[in-house]
Amino acid sequence: MESQSLCLIKNDIFQLLIQLSKEDTEIDIDFTRIILDKLLNTNGIQLAMASTILRFKNPNIYQIIDQRVYRFIYGEIMKEPYSIVTKIDFYIGYLEKLRDICDEYNLDFSLSDRQLYALDKKYNPDFKIKY
């Protein structure tokens, strides 16, 4: 029998997600903190999944946090913090750094997680990722 994981997202989180517009281009840090806190306090949702949900809602503001992209932009292995508050700060800092790199190198922020992931695979093929 195959094991399945189930994640139950409460209605208040859906209501917050509805408030995210695909047309927005500026991050609302306070709102982001609220929604990340709710997502990360949901059983089965870690930072990578929370960032994926946010990216799905608006890729112009949010990108998926990924070990390869992190390594490519910071030059070191990603060490995800333990506490939820620290994870939120970590992700917001990641987005700010990613935005700066996109501005500096004229990259489309909405595609940057995919582009930098591919660059890391190309230029760091011998460095394996721990899952």
Can you name each region flagged by the protein language model?
Residues 50-55:
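Short hydrophobic alpha-helical segments that form membrane-spanning helices or hydrophobic packing faces
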Residues 63-131:
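C-terminal accessory module of base-excision DNA glycosylases/AP lyases that mediates lesion recognition
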Residues 56-62:
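Catalytic Zn2+-binding segment of zinc metalloproteases
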Residues 42:
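Acidic-histidine catalytic/liganding microenvironments
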Residues 1-38:
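Long, highly charged, low-complexity intrinsically disordered interaction regions
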